[in-house]
């Protein structure tokens, strides 16, 4: 049975991006709340092969799972990317989506939640969220397109990120924040009340996102988030 994503949760949870089944098991055993299938060698949202995603879903046990489906140019390509991974056993899919992108022709998989991932470099804001809800997305996340050392907060202020998270709550959407995050970013970003904080490089040795995950860093991230209780006003 596929674990069902918890769209509204009072606790900020840990998303760990993994590249294979071995990393999925590592993330599962050291406290990841959500195990996210992604190829770090192919940019911000590099999709893995369906068979690799299936293996990751199987190795994740009872943890929630997701898989990135790529960076499509338009709604038609997005539909095809999502369809390619719809039968892999993950709890939901993620797809790159530009603010203001025309959703006409977008076909989302039946009974499988899809998260729109907006890139921080494009200047997304809470004003973009209602259109995402209207298009049928179940959630929205901000990540960084470039993996050049700049972090999420180098592109967007905490005030802007707080507005985005609040808009997601108002629309009943799952929300997430990611983008070269370090463990020390947890207090400031968790206080904004997103559903998830997403990590890859910050949980790898030497902060190299293309390297292997460090189990001690995963456990530390889980511990810090479990200990942090954000105070978020109801939308």
Residue map of PLM features:
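N-terminal amphipathic alpha-helix/helix-capping segment at the start of soluble metabolic enzymes
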Residues: 1-17, 58, 233-235
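N-terminal basic/disordered segments at the start of proteins
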Residues: 12-33
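Alpha-helix N-cap and loop-to-helix initiation/capping positions
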Residues: 19, 44-52, 77-80, 152-160, ...
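Conserved, mostly hydrophobic/aromatic
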Residues: 27, 56, 140, 189
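Glycine/small-residue-rich interface belts in oligomeric ring/scaffold proteins
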Residues: 34, 38-64, 68-69
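Glycine-rich phosphate-binding active-site loops on the catalytic face of alpha/beta enzymes
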Residues: 34-45, 88-100, 139-149, 192-218
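C-terminal helical cap(s) of enzyme catalytic domains, especially alpha/beta-barrels
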Residues: 50-60, 103-106, 199-235
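Conserved anion-binding
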Residues: 59-174, 184
